[in-house]
Structure formats: C-alpha cells, structure tokens
A protein has these predicted regions:
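PP2C/PPM-type serine/threonine phosphatase catalytic domain
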Residues: 1-239
Length: 239
C-alpha cells in the first residue's frame, strides 16, 4: 500500500502456488479504513485455512474508528478473541492426529500521520522509503531466536532441523503475544505485508523494484509474476 497526500491506495492478492493442494493464506485489504492484514494458516486438513479466515473475518467486522489508537486496540482484541476460539476448536477436535489450528498474522493500521504494525509469526511487513527497503517486522521463528540470542550464527542456525518452527502464532498458545511497532508515515512511503511464500520466492532486488512502481496494483502484479515463475512451493500472499 502507498501513502499519498490525502489517502492510502492498496492492492491485494493471494495464490495457492504450484505445489500446495489448498490455499491456507487469507488477506484483508481495507484502505478506506486504513486496515490491512495477511494471515498464513497452519494445520492439517482445512485447519490452517479456517484459522487464517477467522482472523480476517473477525478484523473485517470491526466497527470503523477514526481514532488510530482505539482502532489498534480493537484489532488486538479481535486477534485475542480468535486465539481463544482456535484453542477451543483444537480442544473439541483433539481426537484428530493433526489437531493443530493456528495462523501467523501481520496487520497494519494507519492514518495520515502514523501507522502501527502488529504481528505474530513469520509473515512480514516491509517499508520502501527514499529508494531503500526496510524490513520492519522480525520473524517469530526458532531460526530468528537462535540468531537473536547469539546461540548460533545465521548459517549455523539455518541448518537447525527446526529452524522454521514458529515461536508465536495465533492459536499456538493459550496467551497470544503480539509484537507492535509504531512509526510515522511520509508521502511516498510504500508498505508491503506478505507471507513467507512470497518473500522466500523473490529477491530483495525484485521486491525493491516492485515497491518502486507507480501503483500498488502494479507492484503486486510484478511480485506475483516473479514468485510464480519459480517453484512456488508455498501459498503466496501480499498486500
């Protein structure tokens, strides 16, 4: 999504990719409210798709609020509601061998002066500003934890058998822990929310070129054309 002088413009897309049988990602694109979200579901059968869809539905149904701080609080509360619901769903289906129902989430709530990113998991938020690309979110994964705590260097951590395991996600634990980042926005800023299926499929250079294009729709089209030209082993989502 792009910050203009008077309003936000955005575009969204999600795709199953070339390997997965179903798409367990969900996206929310509401520029008129200043709310955007990407959720990457996890779990067997339809569990992941249900988890990500519940997140989007709960946030989409929130009453619009012109106060940014209040709107952020509403989104946080909605995610905690979904976290409790997913815990209940797992409890009643615990006889299934793959009774896992959860989802990453990365959300952006913004007005003309400020934006707030909140997330759990490894879906990401990027900022393109003054011809530079910044990753605003930090993955909640074992890989990132090992690096952050200086237990392993990046190359060694990447070889860990559980490197991709998530340390936070909606539905993963009884208490949901969201990380929150607030920042000022400037005209010309472009922000990207995406699942790991996208950022693992394109280079930083490709992402930078896409976010420098004239419109969000053009950026999304460019990103997906490159991501789908490769193996596309995972679901792909971007806003």
């Amino acid at each position: 999504m792009q910050v203009l002088q008077s309003c936000w413009k955005s575009a969204a897309r999600t795709d199953r990719g070339k390997v997965r049988k179903r798409n367990e990602d969900s996206v929310l694109d509401q520029p008129e409210r200043g709310v955007w979200l990407v959720a990457d579901g996890m779990g067997g059968h339809q569990n992941g798709a249900l988890a990500s869809r519940l997140i989007v539905e709960e946030v989409a149904e929130l009453v619009p609020n012109d106060d940014l701080d209040q709107q952020v609080q509403q989104v946080r509360q909605a995610l905690h509601v979904v976290n409790r619901r997913l815990g209940y769903e797992v409890t009643v289906t615990a006889d299934q061998p793959d009774a896992v129902m959860g989802s990453t989430v990365v959300a952006l709530i913004g007005d003309q002066q400020r934006a707030v990113c909140l997330w759990a998991g490894d879906s990401r938020c990027y900022l393109w500003r003054n011809q530079r690309l910044y990753q605003l979110s930090r993955d909640h994964s074992l890989l990132q934890q090992l690096i952050h705590e200086d237990q392993m260097d990046p190359q060694e951590a990447a070889r860990h058998p559980s490197a991709n395991a998530l340390t936070r996600a909606v539905g993963a634990h009884e208490q949901l822990m969201l990380e929150i980042l607030e920042f000022s926005v400037q005209p010309g800023d472009t922000l990207l929310l995406c699942s790991d299926g996208l950022y693992q499929a394109v280079s930083a250079g490709t992402m930078s070129h896409a976010l420098g294009l004239i419109s969000p729709a053009a950026a999304v089209e460019y990103l997906f054309s490159h991501a789908l030209s490769g193996p596309a082993r995972d679901n792909i989502s971007a806003v």
